[in-house]
Regions:
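Long, low-complexity, serine/threonine/proline-rich intrinsically disordered regulatory regions
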Residues: 73-74
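Right-hand nucleic-acid polymerase module
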Residues: 1-67, 77-128
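Conserved, short, structured surface segments that act as functional micro-motifs
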Residues: 70
Length: 128
């Protein structure tokens, strides 16, 4: 399948949700794809323990250096301070290196996250 069509299809699918934020989470130390999956699964469990109704999709991307990963997320129902609190408390990174932007629906989910999926690193959805 053509990557442009694939990205557009993912964007349309993820665009059905009314997201609150687009976030980029950066690690303090290098993390492999496998380790990133473990940390992102823990973040998901943390949200569940907070007993909040939420939706999330995250995509992993390699840093330009190729030695570590970082994650891009779309979230709904999650206060970004909760993300930063978890990230710092778990010693994964500093909140000043995390980036949170209010989701602008008119840009579409493909603008925010679908473009990373075709890099075929790793991704996960919850609640959608």
């Amino acid at each position: 399948m053509n990557r442009t069509i694939l990205n557009r299809s993912y964007g349309e699918f993820f665009g059905r949700e009314k997201w609150d934020y687009f976030s980029t989470l950066t690690y303090k130390y290098p993390k492999s794809i496998k380790r990133n999956r473990i940390e992102m699964d823990r973040l998901t469990k943390y949200f569940k323990k907070q007993a909040i109704a939420f939706s999330m999709v995250w995509v992993t991307e390699w840093h330009i250096s190729g030695t570590s990963t970082h994650s891009h997320l779309l979230t709904k129902g999650v206060d970004v301070t909760l993300i930063d609190k978890y990230w710092s408390k778990s010693n994964l990174g500093y909140k000043k290196f995390n980036d949170h932007k209010v989701y602008e629906r008119d840009k579409g989910a493909d603008f925010y996250i679908a473009k990373y999926i075709d890099k075929e690193v790793d991704y996960y959805t919850f609640g959608i």
